[in-house]
């Protein structure tokens, strides 16, 4: 409860760093639907912000598909309580909407969204989050921004800033933010498959062991592929082209 007596989210910012193929988009879809139906934000707006329209569309379609994921939601959908419009997806009972937007700082200025999903933040060069968050913070009593990523190869961009921030002692004691950083601590740990759950906590379900092992084995003779495997699958920020693992190292 804030100083005005309004019930608000305790957590304003969440950073989720999770290995590729772990179902981040599906997880975000359930968060959006929960907000649209139960968030109490009459007339509120939610956004997915991605580096291009294709990726934004992927998350948007995940949310739309989830509207048919249960009997109750399917009834809502069939009776046009969930409605697709030119602007996005609307839950007509509360006039809450979900829209997609590309990573564009100018377009982000002056918004007033209540829930913001920043997808694949490892692709962002500049920090668009503050442009969006500023509008939410100033105009919404109850707002939340979620930054999701599998890690990536772009250095000194938004991703590196978020990792540094959410690993800091200051952020550890910040009650208004929360970080879930699933990643290896160093590249030596990749040689033992038992450590892979540090970056892929649901491995075996999403993603499948066989798929990750295949990528790992393909990368053993290729430094560039090793960089990508360590970055996207194991959450390690990589920038050089050394050999990190060979078939002889594998456990």
Task: State where each predicted segment sits.
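Residues immediately C-terminal
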Residues: 123
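Pre-Walker A adenine-sensing motif
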Residues: 1-8
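Walker A/P-loop
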Residues: 8-31
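Post-Walker A helix-loop "phosphate-sensing" segment adjacent to the P-loop in P-loop NTPases
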Residues: 35-43
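Conserved Walker A/P-loop ATP-binding site and its immediately adjacent core
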Residues: 44-65
């Amino acid at each position: 409860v804030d100083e005005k007596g309004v019930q608000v989210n305790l957590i304003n910012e969440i950073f989720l760093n999770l290995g590729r193929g772990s179902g981040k988009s599906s997880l975000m879809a359930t968060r959006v639907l929960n907000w649209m139906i139960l968030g109490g934000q009459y007339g509120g707006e939610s956004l997915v912000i991605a580096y291009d329209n294709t990726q934004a569309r992927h998350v948007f379609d995940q949310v739309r598909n989830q509207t048919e994921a249960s009997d109750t939601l399917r009834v809502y959908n069939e009776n046009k309580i969930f409605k697709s419009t030119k602007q996005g997806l609307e839950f007509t009972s509360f006039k809450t909407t979900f829209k997609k937007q590309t990573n564009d700082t100018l377009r982000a200025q002056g918004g007033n969204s209540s829930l913001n999903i920043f997808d694949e933040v490892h692709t962002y060069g500049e920090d668009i989050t503050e442009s969006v968050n500023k509008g939410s913070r100033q105009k919404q009593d109850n707002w939340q921004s979620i930054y999701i990523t599998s890690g990536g190869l772009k250095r000194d961009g938004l991703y590196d800033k978020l990792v540094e921030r959410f690993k800091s002692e200051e952020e550890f004691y910040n009650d208004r933010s929360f970080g879930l950083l699933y990643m290896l601590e160093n590249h030596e740990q990749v040689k033992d498959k038992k450590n892979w759950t540090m970056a892929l906590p649901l491995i075996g379900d999403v993603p499948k062991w066989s798929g990750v092992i295949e990528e790992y084995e393909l990368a053993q003779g290729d430094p560039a592929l090793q960089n990508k495997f360590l970055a996207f699958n194991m959450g390690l920020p990589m920038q050089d082209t050394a050999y990190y693992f060979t078939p002889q190292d594998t456990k």
